Each structure stands twice: as structure tokens, then as C-alpha cells.
């Protein structure tokens, strides 16, 4: 599967030194995240994968450990962790988090602040941008409860990727397909690119009071101290 990206080649180094967390939940689409993890690693990102226990029924954690070079995190109380509060430690490193595929169950947990496994506790501790890619049966996706939960996540700053429509693993046809890995990668690249919107640009900042002439004698002015301009500069 060859990924084709919308950003120019010279901008691919934007992931160098960046940490991406991938949250994988129980869905048949979980196998696609192996392609995404591999693509991120090739672009020099530091990639950490967190899985729910249900996700391990669809893809083995060893797959992600091989592709990323990092331990795949599943169990909150794993005895092999280094001495640190692991979910907080990983959360602090993250520049962006993507939950894909995101099941109805995990979407509901995140929307209502339920943190009962490694994935949800880590996401609750993250202050970076969070992207959610729902993947489920059409009837589940269109369920008003799921839609309300997605709206709640958007209210709290999550970006929700609308699922594609097509033939689903259950045999139905409709909305609920997770987008292909290359599209998910583009979402991550665009998010990281926002940090560098002004990179290499020259910006002129003016500070202090201004004067606008009414006629040769009178003018309108203000009492601005210029402190805000100095802070911005």
C-alpha cells in the first residue's frame, strides 16, 4: 500500500523530533494502523501505540512494536514499565494523538471522562491535539447516542474525521469505514504543520498609541501603552 500525501516532499521532515500517539481500539480496521505506524516511522516521527484489550484480538501488539521500535502499551499495570507513571509520561511527550479506529465504546468513554484502561487514561492526560477516526457499523455510527458523543468530543477540541461510505466487514453498505492510512497521515501532517505556519516569515508588529487626523489641527488617539505589542514581538 503506497501512501500518497498532499504535502510537498520538502516538508516531510516536519515530523522529525515529533511524538505521535496512536490509539487503536477493537475494530477490524485495526490492521490499517500498521501501515500508518510504518509511514510515520519512515518520516522520522517517534511513534507510540496504545491498544485496548479488544484491539489485541484483531492485531498483535508485537506488530506495532516491530514497526515502531517502541513497546506497545495495553495494560495499565504492566510490571515491565520503567519506574514512571507511564500514562502521564507518554502523554507529556505527545505532539498529536490519533485514535483510529475509534470504536463506539471508546468514543463514549472519552466523551464522558471514563478512564479505565491504558488508552483512555493516557488520552485524558494529553494536552496536545487529539484526532478521532470512528470506524463501526453504519447503524452504530448513525445512532443518536454515538453522534451526541462525537459532538461532545468536538466541543472539547477533538477533531473528528468523518468515516467513508462503502462495503463494510459486516456485509452492510454505508457510512462507517475508516479512511485509508494515507488520509490519516495527512491529518497528522496538517496538524503538525500548524506549529510552523509562521516559520521563515517576517512579521511587522506595531506597538503603542495611534493617531488618526480629523483635520490639520485635530486628531483621534488612544491611551495604548504598547505592552501587548511588545509581548507579541
PLM regions: where:
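A cross-family phosphate/adenosyl-ligand binding-site feature
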Residues: 2-131, 137-226, 230-233
